[in-house]
Design a protein with these regions (language model features):
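Ligand-binding grooves and catalytic loops that recognize ribose/phosphate and carbohydrate rings
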Residues: 72-79, 133, 137, 157-158, ...
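Catalytic pocket-lining loop regions of alpha/beta-barrel enzymes
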Residues: 118-119, 132-234
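Histidine-centered divalent metal-coordination motifs
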Residues: 33-37, 153
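Mid-to-C-terminal alpha-helical segments outside catalytic/metal-binding sites
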Residues: 2-28, 32, 41-59, 109, ...
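Alpha-helical scaffolding within the catalytic cores
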Residues: 43-49, 75-80, 104-107, 174-176, ...
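Active-site gating/metal-coordination segments in enzymes
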Residues: 58-59, 67, 71-157
Length: 275
């Protein structure tokens, strides 16, 4: 096999599934789990709005990787907004809050009133609080009072790839069941859930949205839909930690109907955003 033939066939293999996806989903393709900014522990692929558009992604709810370890939350959110404004409408900023910091209410006000954000993305494990603490319920209620949606990141990466001095356990999601029962109109999504979380800690959380970024295995989406409503499952890539093509290929390889595909790639995200 010569070099030119190898390159041509490899490129065709990479693009054919994405072309198949373009034929099955609607014109709108929303990624609910995208991030920008520097990650201090290793170099991540540099993905921007142009890279997303080339993959057919029309909108990406975007958080900041800087938010996990930076105390100046206001500056992090301001930089995120600047990046998203330059994306031509592709990237939708999801601000962060840290309830362990005294100015979290002011940070929330800025997110909504100054930046016009619709979503807050939370990292409880990196910011050092549990979902059963009163401060989380207080912050959740404050976010909901502003009419905003909430994303909770269950985990960022496998513990085996974490820096040995920064070992961060996944979020304990069990308290969400009672929290959501008491707040039936809350728009809450958990990102990066895996099969174990879905079948244990999140069982019965019927009003909760999840994404597909860490749903793995043969027939992963189909198996998830046996226990989770299609109306609450969204496309999420977890890029740039994961290559975005990974989640797109899950759709191509699935047996989802066109209606289910449209729900997962666009309709459900719009419902979460309240649009």
């Amino acid at each position: 096999m010569n070099r030119r033939f190898f390159i041509q066939t490899s490129a065709a293999a990479a693009t054919t599934p994405l072309l198949a996806l373009n034929q099955t989903h609607s014109a709108e393709l929303v990624d609910v789990n995208f991030a920008t900014g520097k990650w201090p522990f290793r170099e991540l692929p540099k993905l921007n709005s142009e890279a997303l558009k080339q993959l057919g992604i029309t909108r990406a709810i975007t958080g900041s990787l800087e938010a996990l370890l930076t105390r100046d939350v206001a500056a992090v959110n301001a930089r995120l907004v600047a990046v998203c404004k330059a994306s031509g409408g592709v990237m939708l900023a999801a601000g962060t809050l840290n309830p362990r910091l005294p100015a979290w209410r002011e940070d929330l006000r800025r997110c909504r009133e100054e930046h016009g954000m619709k979503v807050i993305r939370l990292h409880p494990n990196y910011h050092g609080y549990q979902l059963d603490e009163p401060l989380f319920a207080e912050m959740l209620d404050a976010i909901l009072e502003f009419g905003m949606a909430v994303q909770i990141v269950a985990q960022m990466e496998d513990h085996r790839t974490q820096h040995p001095l920064v070992q961060v356990a996944p979020v304990d999601l069990k308290p969400l069941h009672d929290l959501l029962q008491a707040r039936p109109k809350a728009r809450v999504m958990v990102l990066n859930t895996n099969a174990t979380m879905i079948t244990t800690a999140l069982r019965g959380c019927v009003s909760l949205w999840i994404d597909c970024a860490m749903i793995e295995g043969v027939g992963g989406l189909e198996n998830t839909l046996k226990i989770w409503p299609i109306e609450k499952l969204c496309l999420g890539t977890h890029a740039p930690f994961f290559y975005p093509e990974s989640s797109l290929l899950k759709l191509v390889e699935s047996d989802l109907s066109k209606t289910q595909m449209t729900s997962m790639t666009a309709v459900n995200a719009r419902a979460f955003l309240g649009t």
